[in-house]
């Protein structure tokens, strides 16, 4: 099984390292053709407005939707979660509303956990994990609405931080910035369920 990491910007190298620690075959995705034969794809953290622009300019926007429709597992972390969302709030007032791929029935508020200087790590109880996960929040979004098709798997206080809808995961935090590979293992399990 081979999974991909969107490698346009952001923390893609760290995701690749975590996946390789688990023995997964990993391909960096920069072009639509790079999606061929993958079982899953991670959309990493970075800057969501830039990521949307690069996806659009690089011709990946619609192929990502097709990849999902064909059964590919997806996991968006931080900015990647924003890109997967149906509705995105809190973009710059000087820009038009930021589109999301709409593959996850959630509303996301950008940068809701604060600015770069407000970054923090917190133990997060995540459904399905046996112990708290050391979640790293950096200019992190908050999932403000979880639609009926999705389910919240973790909250920090009253803020949703991790959700799942079928074979799509979204995390408001950066799991790749820890040595803990449990969520990457969960993602590989979802990717392994793909039937070609």
UniProtKB/Swiss-Prot annotation:
<keyword id="KW-0315">Glutamine amidotransferase</keyword>
<feature type="binding site">
    <location>
        <position position="110"/>
    </location>
    <ligand>
        <name>L-glutamine</name>
    </ligand>
</feature>
<comment type="subunit">
    <text>In the presence of PdxS, forms a dodecamer of heterodimers. Only shows activity in the heterodimer.</text>
</comment>
<comment type="pathway">
    <text>Cofactor biosynthesis; pyridoxal 5'-phosphate biosynthesis.</text>
</comment>
<comment type="similarity">
    <text>Belongs to the glutaminase PdxT/SNO family.</text>
</comment>
<dbReference type="GO" id="GO:0008614">
    <property type="term" value="P:pyridoxine metabolic process"/>
</dbReference>
<dbReference type="GO" id="GO:0005829">
    <property type="term" value="C:cytosol"/>
</dbReference>
<keyword id="KW-0663">Pyridoxal phosphate</keyword>
<feature type="active site" description="Nucleophile">
    <location>
        <position position="78"/>
    </location>
</feature>
<dbReference type="InterPro" id="IPR002161">
    <property type="entry name" value="PdxT/SNO"/>
</dbReference>
<keyword id="KW-0378">Hydrolase</keyword>
<dbReference type="GO" id="GO:0006543">
    <property type="term" value="P:glutamine catabolic process"/>
</dbReference>
<keyword id="KW-0456">Lyase</keyword>
<feature type="binding site">
    <location>
        <begin position="46"/>
        <end position="48"/>
    </location>
    <ligand>
        <name>L-glutamine</name>
    </ligand>
</feature>
<dbReference type="Pfam" id="PF01174">
    <property type="entry name" value="SNO"/>
</dbReference>
<dbReference type="GO" id="GO:0036381">
    <property type="term" value="F:pyridoxal 5'-phosphate synthase (glutamine hydrolysing) activity"/>
</dbReference>
<feature type="active site" description="Charge relay system">
    <location>
        <position position="174"/>
    </location>
</feature>
<dbReference type="GO" id="GO:0004359">
    <property type="term" value="F:glutaminase activity"/>
</dbReference>
<dbReference type="InterPro" id="IPR029062">
    <property type="entry name" value="Class_I_gatase-like"/>
</dbReference>
<feature type="binding site">
    <location>
        <begin position="138"/>
        <end position="139"/>
    </location>
    <ligand>
        <name>L-glutamine</name>
    </ligand>
</feature>
<dbReference type="InterPro" id="IPR021196">
    <property type="entry name" value="PdxT/SNO_CS"/>
</dbReference>
<dbReference type="GO" id="GO:0042823">
    <property type="term" value="P:pyridoxal phosphate biosynthetic process"/>
</dbReference>
<comment type="function">
    <text>Catalyzes the hydrolysis of glutamine to glutamate and ammonia as part of the biosynthesis of pyridoxal 5'-phosphate. The resulting ammonia molecule is channeled to the active site of PdxS.</text>
</comment>
<dbReference type="GO" id="GO:1903600">
    <property type="term" value="C:glutaminase complex"/>
</dbReference>
<protein>
    <recommendedName>
        <fullName>Pyridoxal 5'-phosphate synthase subunit PdxT</fullName>
        <ecNumber>4.3.3.6</ecNumber>
        <ecNumber>3.5.1.2</ecNumber>
    </recommendedName>
</protein>
<feature type="active site" description="Charge relay system">
    <location>
        <position position="176"/>
    </location>
</feature>
């Amino acid at each position: 099984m081979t999974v991909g990491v969107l490698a346009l910007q952001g923390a893609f190298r760290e995701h690749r390292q975590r996946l390789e620690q688990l023995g997964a075959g990993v391909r960096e995705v920069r072009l639509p053709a790079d999606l061929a034969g993958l079982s899953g794809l991670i959309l990493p953290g970075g800057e969501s407005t830039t990521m949307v622009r690069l996806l659009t300019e690089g011709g990946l926007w619609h192929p990502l939707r097709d990849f999902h429709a064909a059964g590919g597992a997806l996991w968006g972390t931080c900015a990647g979660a924003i890109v997967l969302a149906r509705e995105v709030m809190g973009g710059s007032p000087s820009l038009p509303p930021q589109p999301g791929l709409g593959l996850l029935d959630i509303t996301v508020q950008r940068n809701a956990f604060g600015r770069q200087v407000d970054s923090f790590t917190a133990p997060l109880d995540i459904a399905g994990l046996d112990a708290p996960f050391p979640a790293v929040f950096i200019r992190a979004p908050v999932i403000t609405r979880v639609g009926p098709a999705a389910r919240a798997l973790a909250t920090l206080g009253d803020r949703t931080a991790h959700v799942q809808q079928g074979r799509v995961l979204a995390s408001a935090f950066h799991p790749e910035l820890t040595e803990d590979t449990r969520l990457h293992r969960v993602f590989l399990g979802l990717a392994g369920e793909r039937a070609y």
